[in-house]
Design a protein with these regions (language model features):
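Short beta-strand/loop motif that positions the catalytic acidic residue
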Residues: 283, 289-291
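Alpha/beta-hydrolase active-site loop
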Residues: 90-110
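N-terminal cap/lid segment of alpha/beta-hydrolase-fold proteins
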Residues: 2-32
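Catalytic active-site module of serine/aspartate enzymes centered on a nucleophile-bearing elbow/loop
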Residues: 312, 316-357
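Alpha/beta-hydrolase-fold enzymes
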Residues: 110-114, 124-261
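Glycine-rich "HGGG/HGxG" loop immediately N-terminal to the catalytic nucleophile
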Residues: 74-91, 329-331
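Conserved alpha/beta-hydrolase "acid-adjacent" motif
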Residues: 296-303
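Short, surface-exposed "cap/lid" segments of acyl-processing enzymes
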Residues: 27, 32-83
Length: 357
């Protein structure tokens, strides 16, 4: 695996906003060397593109720049840097797959021309990406890295129960749940709910416990020992509100063990497949599936995806890499991820670039 100990400076080159076809304002940031192959970084739900650009550690944009790649950091509508998790119209992951990711790719291609474009996606961002790809909305990508989950979501029984309770019992009463316990206050009508969600866990920080029991659906989102203390102290900045309106779609995907379309009766979403696995033959680029060996959020979803794709679609160039001792989010925000994780990504990009040359 590539040795990635150097720490070059990485100034922001460009930041701009764009509006999707359904009227949602999103942002893209470009960093890294000019005229280099481009890598679109797609974050998970309720975090933001900042998970890829942490100043306290050597992050993936540092590593990609040192390896000769240009990073494009997307904040899609599920970003905590944007207002849509707390206000604005409800959305599903169909909207991310149909609008956010394809239109971000189109904006990037306007600027890079015919240079190779890769995508590195995490968690829900990777689930939505799988819908976009199997809809044929992202032709000609040079390669894709999906971390944690891709086409075949799989969660624990306890997480399944939490998603059910969140969507059926709380969804009609609560619009969103804050990750930052300090925003709730002692006299809020939701204080007891937040106290219940954050009462368990080894960490004394209530926000950390909320992150695990909220976004993690009761599972650990990361291994504590892998986080820099400065990153842990900023969890309230890195995580935002949890919109409960997305839970029914997530539950439907988990029950199907596949990325599926939610809006099956709405013609506006007709371009998306009802079941992404049934259209996996539309994947036209190499795919690297990554997962931590201790991923409690999605268990062995990506190992399952590798096995299913290898059996059903042997023509797809897919490989699976498991990162020993890592959980879920620490594969990107862990203080040692530059040494333990990112080298696998760079090796994949380099190998694919060599084939294209």
């Amino acid at each position: 695996m590539t040795d990635l100990r150097a720490t070059p400076e990485l100034p922001a080159v460009e930041m701009f906003s764009f509006r999707t076809a359904d009227g949602v304002d999103l942002t893209l940031r470009r960093v890294g060397p000019a005229d280099a192959p481009a890598v679109l970084l797609v974050h998970g739900h309720g975090v933001s593109s900042e998970m890829f650009a942490l100043p306290e550690i050597r992050d993936i944009t540092d590593v990609l720049a040192d390896a000769g790649y240009q990073s494009w950091l997307l904040d899609w509508r599920g970003s905590c840097r944007l207002p849509y998790n707390e206000s604005g119209p409800a959305y599903t992951f169909d909207d991310v797959a149909l609008y956010d990711i394809p239109e971000a790719v189109a904006r990037i291609r306007e600027r890079i021309g015919d240079r190779p474009l890769y995508v590195v996606a995490h968690c829900i961002g990777a689930l939505a990406l799988s819908l976009s790809m199997t809809a044929g909305l992202l032709p000609g990508l040079a390669g894709v890295v999906a971390q944690g989950v891709f086409l075949t979501p799989k969660v624990s029984t306890s997480a399944r129960v939490r998603v059910l309770l969140g969507s059926e019992l709380l969804g009609s009463r609560v619009g969103h749940i804050e990750s930052d316990f300090r925003k709730v206050g002692l006299w809020s009508k939701r204080t007891l709910l937040y106290a219940a969600l954050s009462r368990k866990g080894d960490c004394p920080d209530p926000t950390c416990r909320m992150v695990h029991h909220g976004w993690g659906m009761g599972a650990k989102l990361f291994e504590h020992d892998h986080l820099d203390p400065r990153t842990h102290d900023r969890l309230a900045e890195l995580f935002g509100a949890i919109p409960l309106s997305v839970l029914p779609h997530l539950r439907q995907m988990e029950l199907a063990h596949a990325a599926v379309r939610w809006n099956v009766d709405d013609d506006r979403y007709g371009a998306l497949p009802e079941n992404a696995l049934d259209h996996a033959d539309r994947i036209d680029c190499p795919v690297l599936l990554l997962s931590g060996s201790r991923n409690e959020a999605w268990l062995d979803s990506n190992k399952l995806c590798y096995e299913v794709l290898s059996a059903r679609n042997p023509g797809i160039d897919v490989r699976y890499t498991e990162i020993p001792s890592y959980g879920h989010l620490d594969t990107f925000i862990g203080r040692g991820a530059a040494l333990d994780v990112f080298g696998h990504i760079v090796d994949f990009l380099d190998e694919t670039s060599a084939r294209l040359a």
